[in-house]
Amino acid sequence: MSKGSAWGRPVTAPACMEVQIGAVRYRRDGALLLAASSLSSRTWGGSIWVFKDPEGAPNESLCTAGVQTEAGVTDVAWVSEKGILVASDSGAVELWEILEKESLLVNKFAKYEHDDIVKTLSVFSDGTQAVSGGKDFSVKVWDLSQKAVLKSYNAHSSEVNCVAACPGKDTIFLSCGEDGRILLWDTRKPKPATRIDFCASDTIPTSVTWHPEKDDTFACGDETGNVSLVNIKNPDSAQTSAVHSQNITGLAYSYHSSPFLASISEDCTVAVLDADFSEVFRDLSHRDFVTGVAWSPLDHSKFTTVGWDHKVLHHHLPSEGRTENLIATKAED
């Protein structure tokens, strides 16, 4: 049965951020959202943090707002301008709202609909619905205004690694799981899930993200470090590149008219592919798993990565006229 936390309870920022930073997201105005977790004794603790100036992260004293969560945080997403959706180790999906000139985070709900860790979530374009996936093999579609699950699916036979809502399509999303399957969902259909098979799909997919300009195309990362570009209408034509040597932990497209694709991995590296699927950037600065990546909406050449090494690194692509040169940089700590 679903249970909620204390509604409307304001919480002040904690004194210290956990060591392992697990997710990063930009708001449209450039504000940066971080999620952090750490293991204390036998339990995971977590927190979320907002930095109006991203250059201040992860310095706690420079945050705009922050809050301790009841368990570790696996994923976060902005909901419009004031909401923050949280995926929790506890099995809960939580919604927080930032108030009081953005100095205070207030809990709006916490719903324990998953029977295990919530690993991933994604918010649809209209900001009223979201999708989550968990270690309980389930995918759930949420009505955020009603604080309720609209639909729950069990099409995966193992834990769900990633979900991705389709930009501009409020009934379509992707999911991938440890069962090796990538599923295309359309919740309007009686049988909403369709399996997407392509030439490199004999490995376990770990991350998926939609191409921002093409609603029939998505990128996929897998456990071996491969990144693939897949057209839903012709999946056998997928392009695949061995970008990393270990598990892909995240993918993110830039805001360019011909968007770049950033990838991060457990091999502790960061890479960027251009529209021709050629590598134009690589960074080796992280000293542990890289776990989050997001592009700045204000400076399209800038993107940010975070990792279990507690680093928040801001990277800059070379000018578009020089992207044919492979760049290997060491970002500032």
From Swiss-Prot:
Question: Known Pfam families for this protein?
Answer: WD40
Q: Which UniProt keywords apply?
A: Cytoplasm, Nucleus, Repeat, WD repeat
Gene Ontology CC annotations of this record: cytosol; histone methyltransferase complex; methylosome
Which locations, inside or outside the cell, does it occupy? Cytoplasm; Nucleus
Give start and end residues of every WD repeat. Answer: 16-59, 68-106, 113-152, 155-195, 199-240, 243-283, 285-328
Where is it mainly found? Answer: cytoplasm
For the biological process aspect of GO, one term held by this record is: oocyte axis specification
Q: In which tissues is it expressed?
A: Detected in egg (at protein level).
Give yes or no: UniProt keyword Manganese.
no
Q: Write out the function statement from the record.
A: Non-catalytic component of the 20S prmt5-containing methyltransferase complex, which modifies specific arginines to dimethylarginines in several spliceosomal Sm proteins and histones. Required for normal prmt5 methyltransferase activity.
- Quaternary data: Heterotetramer; dimer of heterodimer with prmt5. Interacts with histone h2a and h4 and with nucleoplasmin.
Annotated protein name in UniProt? Methylosome protein WDR77
User: Taxonomic lineage per UniProt?
Assistant: Eukaryota, Metazoa, Chordata, Craniata, Vertebrata
